[in-house]
Amino acid sequence: MKIIVCCKVVPNEEELQVLPNRELGFNGVPWKISQYDLNALESGKQLAAGGGSMTALSIGSTEALGSSKIQKDILSRGPDSLKLVLDDSKPFQDSLQTAKAIAGAVQAAGDYDLVLCGMGSSDLYFQEVGVQVGALLGLPAVNNVTGITPAGEGVLHVERTLENEVEVLDADGNVKEDAAVLSVSSEINVPSVPAMRDIMKAGKKPVEKLDCPDCGEPSLRTLEQLAPEQQERRQELVEGDGEEAVDALVRFLKKEGF
């Protein structure tokens, strides 16, 4: 089985800065693999271990994907190779535009039997790209996948959790016409941490750059990005023990009008 895993690189949200004007500061913020795509990479690795190959596919800017560090991070998590689409002219914040770029890149990547995605991305979490990729490729798409089990002869048992039940589907990856696009949830597995040997091997795996497919103009434009307005929180330290501290607290609350 030939597996393509789509993964997005996003700014590390733990190091974002909120500027005085409430805009988000991205200067110096490192890039990382989207948390939900780590689950997709882990699922791909587990399936490929049973017999098959795995290719990672990522689309984004040169700033996000151009460093060898982030490329090695992706490759250390199981893929045999990495295909990149670098385009600094598009922010890829429109889910349909992103899906068109991914679908074109998947077709350019060659033969495949299964396409895996995360349910959403850590930064935008639209939860739309996977099903849109399936529609553009003319393939069945299943989202919120919580389990994938090989059933022999290229067939996969796919589970997804609905509100009151678990739905079980069969996906046949024997021929390209029966390929599928699966968007996995974070519940499907716990992503493993790459061992040192995996990191060392990652530097020797092939990285190929693909031309950006024609994905049209975005239907969404970002006008501004603002953090929630911060409210000043007042603090009062009440010292003392027992009744003395209680009396001081009551006096403070009365003074503040509570």
Segments (PLM) and residue ranges:
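N-terminal glycine-rich FAD/FM-binding segment characteristic of electron-transfer flavoproteins
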Residues: 1-258
